[in-house]
């Protein structure tokens, strides 16, 4: 069974319209660069972009492909296991046909998703593997899964904001608490009074760059965005809810967030819509002198541990 994502869905729709099976290969047990590249999607990479080129760039070497045995398709040469098959036209089954639980699999928000009524079927034609293959996969919603999913989120936001206001957005972290998609922490640098308010424009651009994003937390350049304690510290000491919260109701977001349903709020017209929110935890530029972090002298460790390296 398969539940294809774009752009693969485009190919399956074309094949089904022609009444033809779509040959596909599934490579299991590949190197980390390939798994990371597989997470990329629009707008970071447009439809039709070859994500394997990202994997090649990350590993400094092209990804080797090999011809499948039973179908006219290629597979990743050094995969532990390769499943060869065809996506059958006009064939559908319930996603939970084996369990009958009404549930499918653990999803990135941390909940088990509802089983789809009808998903496409793959007819397996061959399985090839290395000697003593290792079945290695990523199961969500763990840290590994959501951190990989966050990479294209971060890339999309950095790219769009940098083009609009060069040098202002220093870094982005698609926080694992949001599954790498729903929550982003933006580190913004205000260099002059004219930059006040631009941090909020950066947050709006982030929503445009990655439509699945739900919440943005804005912090200053002296806050470590990869340290949740530091981010929460900024929220406690540099944020006032009545003036630093910006809400944008009725915006398309992600249907796997169970709170994004009409039953949760009358402002949600249909599943997958949300109230997007900006939490501005940056210091107003004219008050920066009141928000200097405590500094401590550097400690020469070798005074106490002469052999310390």
Question: Where are the regions a protein language model picked out?
Answer:
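Charged, compositionally biased interaction regions
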Residues: 30-309
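Internal mixed beta-strand/loop scaffold within catalytic domains of large alpha/beta enzymes
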Residues: 1-27
């Amino acid at each position: 069974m398969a539940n294809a994502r774009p752009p693969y869905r485009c190919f399956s729709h074309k094949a089904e319209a022609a009444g033809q099976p779509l040959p596909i290969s599934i490579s299991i047990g590949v190197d980390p660069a390939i798994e990371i590249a597989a997470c990329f999607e629009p707008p970071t990479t447009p439809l039709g972009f070859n994500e394997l080129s990202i994997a090649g760039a990350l590993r400094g070497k092209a990804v080797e492909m090999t011809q499948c045995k039973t179908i006219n398709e290629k597979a990743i040469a050094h995969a532990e296991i390769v499943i060869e098959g065809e996506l059958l036209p006009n064939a559908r089954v319930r996603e939970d046909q084996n369990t009958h639980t009404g549930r499918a699999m653990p999803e990135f928000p941390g909940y088990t998703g509802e089983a789809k009524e009808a998903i496409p079927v793959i007819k397996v034609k061959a399985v090839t593997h290395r000697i003593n293959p290792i079945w290695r996969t990523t199961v969500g919603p763990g840290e590994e899964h959501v951190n990989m999913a966050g990479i294209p989120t971060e890339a999309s936001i950095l790219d769009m904001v940098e083009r609009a206001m060069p040098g202002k957005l220093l870094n982005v972290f698609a926080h694992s608490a949001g599954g790498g998609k729903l929550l982003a922490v933006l580190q913004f640098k205000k260099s002059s009074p004219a930059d006040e308010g631009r941090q909020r424009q950066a947050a709006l651009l982030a929503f445009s760059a990655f439509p699945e994003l739900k919440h943005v937390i804005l912090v200053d350049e002296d806050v470590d965005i990869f340290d949740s304690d530091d981010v929460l510290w900024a929220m406690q000491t540099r944020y006032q809810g009545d003036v630093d919260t910006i809400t944008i109701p009725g915006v398309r977001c992600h249907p796997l967030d169970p709170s994004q349903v009409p039953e949760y709020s009358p402002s949600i017209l249909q599943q997958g819509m949300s109230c997007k929110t900006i939490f501005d935890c940056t210091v107003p530029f004219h008050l920066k002198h009141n928000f200097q972090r405590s500094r401590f002298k550097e400690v020469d460790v070798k005074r106490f541990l002469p052999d310390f390296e």
